């Protein structure tokens, strides 16, 4: 279903916040004796023993042959909860692409501190799957904690990894046991399959995940009609102090003026839709002051010369450098032609990252071929590589670092989960990728990007990706791109990666569904993407705010509750700017502490000012008002 929108539209508050009219899923607070948890649909979140989170999330995952998640539809849902226990019984079906799976689920919590989750399902037709079953997310704050697992071969003692582990830290798990910071103990037992753990920080999830069906077993696996799957996970907690009383205090955000780093160069991706920037786009984007435009260039495909010429023109119009991610053909085919084209360019080339066709990680031969081609053309530009995919691939590779001046990897927060809360959780894990990457690459330039809400492509697909159904968005597009949530996520990401020491960042694209401004030449819209031609997205204003401090510093910020409020603090001389972002759908009261600050003003981008900011960006950016002692962030 498509519709035509030619000018500003007054969307609902929910659409402005997170891209759809429907309210966020209802949450229920539950207790099982000393354990507490939050129920959301068929998932348990934030299972705590006292004040200590022992399970970040417990959920059932149905993944198709390309690792796409097939979401459940509940056929029956019954919750009975008391003061010290609860029982959830439900029936669900997961239907999508080739997958057709129906299952009965139960999650039961008892006063003795035990939560048991059971899955009993059946395939309703033949299909290929990579995974079906419960997943347990252990919080990343367990890094360095000793744990003991039961396996078929006996007890094994190990640790939750500190630096991000490229491979599984625990195998063949029947149970895992560890202490909590408060002095309690948690034991998690697994039945119905073989289980192992992976370090999900590789994909910026803020967790370690225990899952069923070890990856050493070839996949995808065919389920035949009538095949059954049964699993059970049991969480037991005991000991430790009771939880602290709930506080009605504001979320406290504290800026540390004594710890800072230079604001990293921040660029944008060249728009993948291919349409050139209009004069109006260029005028708006000059306020964002992108340090560079990143151009993915497949030298094996026809037309790359025209795309390079267009990107060069756009970079020049924006006073930006050009960064190139080049995929060369067999034996470096295309590299000499690329070098010749760049030697005629009149814009600065920030870096060239090179890969061989069909490869996700840079190899030694393509680097050597690039240096030979560029040397022959008399070009002297930084040459590097890394991975076109996630930090995982970088972490698992043996890189020819001696031949690299820059090392890169990408980030998107939706490899495993897609809800707002999970996306917000990833912000705490982004710095961990920088810390672990720095241990690999040393003092070489570490560049992160593209950083997008959805992946530009699926690097883990084992078959052809299905085309979107009519009225649906492509897998590369997120309906939250033009929303306030995306702006908050962006501010939190720049804070996380900038303070962690990334040397350069690339976010989103210039225009279009993956950009910071909507296209002006494309009035026919998919109704699930709420925009109008030329609309300025909230992420634009975050980047424009940062651009005004591009020669300054980024300051450390203590987030009192990062799931509710994200922040970014910038300083340039005597000027200080703090961006606060409410990551929820409710008003949050914030106590902002900035030692030595005075004479403050504020500008608020919320559901009330959204349309003005989107249609009259210059007028919106010129507005401000005095800032009080405490801020209610809408």
What are these regions (language model features)?
Residues 2-91, 147, 290, 294, ...:
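Acidic-aromatic substrate-binding/catalytic surfaces of carbohydrate-active enzymes
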Residues 63-121, 196-207:
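Extended, loop-rich substrate-binding clefts of extracytoplasmic carbohydrate-active enzymes
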Residues 108, 112-193, 598-621:
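Polysaccharide-binding surfaces and accessory modules of carbohydrate-active proteins
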Residues 269-302, 314-318, 345:
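Catalytic domains of carbohydrate-active enzymes, especially glycoside hydrolases
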Residues 560-597, 602-607:
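Carbohydrate-binding surface patches
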